[in-house]
Regions:
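Intrinsically disordered, low-complexity, charge-rich terminal extensions
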Residues: 1-177
Length: 177
């Protein structure tokens, strides 16, 4: 593999960082509630593991904050100094179902996807049923992430809306201090 960045790689990193940073803000400012165009409401929350990054080259700094019941103060402080989220653990909830997934900003790589537990009714079940349900749950999770990303792009690509969103994000950061 080449060390030369592919065309658009730097844009992807910035867009990914802006997305995860916006997602953290929106998940707290909107109590984690999102809605699909079909009207399905779901919750999306940043879990207790966030990594923020800022700077370039040799002055690149990364801070990772994790811990049960952590308020993520150090990561929020990093945001207020210009860092952006570069990795986050997300929790998605719909009704009684819960998914968790780790997302990297640089390439939207998803790791450690955990789906809701699949209930086994009995030994007479179709052997493919559990597999197909697992695939359905994975696709559902990815669909929710795609929807939130679509909402982000709608705001991000409208300059006036993005400026308003930046103001709201700064107010959110100031309120958290």
């Amino acid at each position: 593999m080449s060390d030369t960045p592919y065309m658009g790689e730097l844009t992807d990193v910035v867009l990914g960082q802006e997305f995860l940073t916006w997602l953290w803000f929106r998940s707290e400012a909107g109590n984690g509630q999102f809605r699909t165009p079909e009207g399905v409401t779901f919750g999306l929350f940043m879990e207790q593991r966030i990594s923020v990054q800022g700077g370039e080259g040799e002055s690149l700094e990364t801070a990772t904050v994790s811990g049960p019941m952590s308020e993520l103060r150090e990561a929020r402080l990093g945001l207020s100094t210009g860092k952006k989220v570069n990795r986050a653990l997300l929790r998605i909830e719909r009704d009684a179902d819960t998914w968790t997934v780790s997302v990297k900003a640089e390439d939207f790589q998803m790791n450690s996807l955990k789906t809701p537990v699949i209930e086994k009714d009995g030994e007479d079940d179709d052997p493919d049923a559990a597999f197909l349900e697992k695939i359905y749950l994975i696709e559902t999770c990815l669909g929710y992430i795609d929807e939130v990303y679509r909402q982000f792009l709608t705001v991000r690509l409208a300059p006036a809306d993005w400026q308003e969103e930046i103001k709201a994000l700064r107010n959110w950061l100031a309120a958290g201090d």
